[in-house]
Amino acid sequence: MAIERTFSIIKPDAVAKNHIGAIYNRFETAGLKIIASKMVHLSQEQAEGFYAEHSERPFFGALVAFMTSGPIMVQTLEGENAVLAHREILGATNPAEAAEGTIRADFAESIDENAAHGSDSVASAEREVAYFFSTEELCPRTR
């Protein structure tokens, strides 16, 4: 098994509903370790930069507006096959299709406000972690 890092966002809808602790509990219960975490309120420029790959998609404006509508939690998670493990915990992008017991099934309202984001690959995780965290901010567990 490979120890990986992945990037995670708890989106404005879930932060506003005080689900941060419950979501962190899901990560830790699944064996993922939080090695960096902070709350940020994205500027339009930050949101547009983070989601630049979607800039030509019709939903881009609404996505940026949503992601700047309130604070978010960003975190780096570490564990065995962390990218896949985290995505399984999140559930399907559309909460109506998410398996029972997943974060999106339990905490999301709609496909547009779906509670959380997770990297889709190790390469994406590396890019996304670097967007929000310096190397010095990452604190691998030593015990």
Swiss-Prot record:
Transferase among keywords: yes
Enzyme Commission code(s) on record: 2.7.4.6
Compartments, as annotated in UniProt: Cytoplasm
Chief location: cytoplasm
EC class (word): transferase
Active site: 117
BP term (GO), one: CTP biosynthetic process
Binding partners and assembly: Homotetramer.
GO CC annotations on file: cytoplasm
Protein name: Nucleoside diphosphate kinase
Binding site for ATP: 11, 59, 87, 93, 104, 114
Required cofactor names: Mg(2+)
UniProt record similarity statement: Belongs to the NDK family.
